[in-house]
From Swiss-Prot:
Species this protein is from: Schizosaccharomyces pombe (strain 972 / ATCC 24843) (Fission yeast)
Name of the protein described by the UniProt record: GTP-binding protein ypt1
Coiled-coil boundaries: none
Gene responsible for this protein: ypt1
SUPFAM superfamilies noted in UniProt: P-loop containing nucleoside triphosphate hydrolases (SSF52540)
Gene Ontology biological process terms in this record: autophagosome assembly; endoplasmic reticulum to Golgi vesicle-mediated transport; intracellular protein transport
MF-aspect GO terms: GTP binding; GTPase activity
Function of the protein: The small GTPases Rab are key regulators of intracellular membrane trafficking, from the formation of transport vesicles to their fusion with membranes. Rabs cycle between an inactive GDP-bound form and an active GTP-bound form that is able to recruit to membranes different set of downstream effectors directly responsible for vesicle formation, movement, tethering and fusion. Ypt1 regulates the trafficking of secretory vesicles from the endoplasmic reticulum (ER) to the Golgi.
Amino acid sequence: MNPEYDYLFKLLLIGDSGVGKSCLLLRFADDTYTESYISTIGVDFKIRTFELEGKTVKLQIWDTAGQERFRTITSSYYRGAHGIIIVYDVTDQDSFNNVKQWLQEIDRYAVEGVNRLLVGNKSDMVDKKVVEYSVAKEFADSLNIPFLETSAKDSTNVEQAFLTMSRQIKERMGNNTFASSNAKSSVKVGQGTNVSQSSSNCC
């Protein structure tokens, strides 16, 4: 048994490029924010450990590239994931419309019963918002998926999003501590790299 944690969960952040996945990860893992973040090529991950309902949970959070042409790279990373957060940009209708495609990717590559969470990011950009909360909530409810609007810029609901996902995975796993020890999710540190490609608004 590992004395450092009771649970080790692998989470994925997926969604179109530019919706703010990397910024959500930076805000949750490091409590930092930058207006212009280098777009992720391939996969990168961060780790954060915290207490949840009297247990120590270690999250390994993978930030997958959103561009269509990199989906073949990230498909292998769906395997072994305990939870997947689908992110769209509340100021970008197309990114919300594409959520259905990302859900199909989950059905195709992830394990059956994997926990899912829908997140509408950049909620601080009220004047530019085009995807209404009620529309996204109705969509999420129809699929029985939890839904939150977040802002990596002002921290709104970022912590709540990851805690919600962690709590759901913990409930699904029951009292099986070290739940992920049997999952085929081992990956080598350093496989994911960041390459300077383009800057994107990170909200």
